[in-house]
């Protein structure tokens, strides 16, 4: 963020607040290159080290300075369009660099809004595990939950019109429009799956920018109406500056609701509604009745249809009772479990029996999908029986053990928040035995002979539980650590979850 701010201030002083000239700056492509090496959140890395270099960028900038070269590359020997979809290296590099330049003002706006609201930066809050303590604190007191998948894609023209309110530089806006419409036909949606998949892989940063912008626009209106319209003049709604036709959109939504419901905004004022999202999936939970949740359901459908012209099937948004149904979010099945208890109270000669029900959030590891994932990458078969990993048999013993250890520790690190650790122990057992079988295969031996020769203590020490390691470091507190470790542990250093 600080690098972005320095670069943007430099460009502003020289280019009068225009973003378009930034695509002629070499450091923009350096930032895109660095992002490509370090990011693998939604899309796989495409080998940026093979596709980007300072020489290629210099050559690209020189060609962009040529007149009319940004429209059609007439000098290309293969006669391909300069912006041809996934056919030209230059178009991909420009799209990545342009995505960086467009992200800069949004990053600065976010920083300024946080400073105005006096929100302290906390890297712990960036961890996706920080969501689960929130679940533990709030969800036992709620009754209903709804799984909502944000519909995507949005029509191109709607996306362009939304972006027009934010991108004030006309040249940048026209270049952005050129990118979008050259990648897709005018009358197509952004959604044939083969197109969206190819586009997300060939231009990951540009794709993420468009998707995140759409989600941000949807959530800004959703949360604004959730907090009722009187909040518009407060500091918390600073993200709505310079919005054109925003009031008109709200009036249109109000008219839609006025036709369907007697009261328009009263159901936005419920203090017990909670909204959580990660990537394209969100959770909506409330303490109110199913009738209230059903209103929210159709409110979201109207919002998508009226404001973004995206169709969402009402039957795909399910409203379930938390005590009877589990919802899947961030790799866990979660539900609210009822723990009934009976307390006998004695007062003088009279005794009373008091029945009490405690609610507790359960987080369960999805063992069957995890075993399927392990079977897909050849750690076990479809039934969960460990098998060797032949692809790794050519590596050294140290590399083989290190790979298995990293996978085992990462899974243990992520799923230590489970209420029931039995499933986690099963996954560890599969990885441990698969490691032994891979080593035995490499040395052309059986598992029994290999362990007898090497000694089973070695792998036992390598796969030692974190609980045992802590007890060795703090022997006096071993009993306390044992009770703590058997409970749920949420780590605040996990920043993304790769599906």
Swiss-Prot record:
One of its GO terms (cellular component) is chloroplast. Its main location: plastid. It holds the Pfam family Intron_maturas2. Disulfide bonds: none annotated. GO terms for biological process: mRNA processing; RNA splicing; tRNA processing. HAMAP family: MatK (MF_01390). This is Maturase K. The lineage of its organism: Eukaryota, Viridiplantae, Streptophyta, Embryophyta, Tracheophyta.
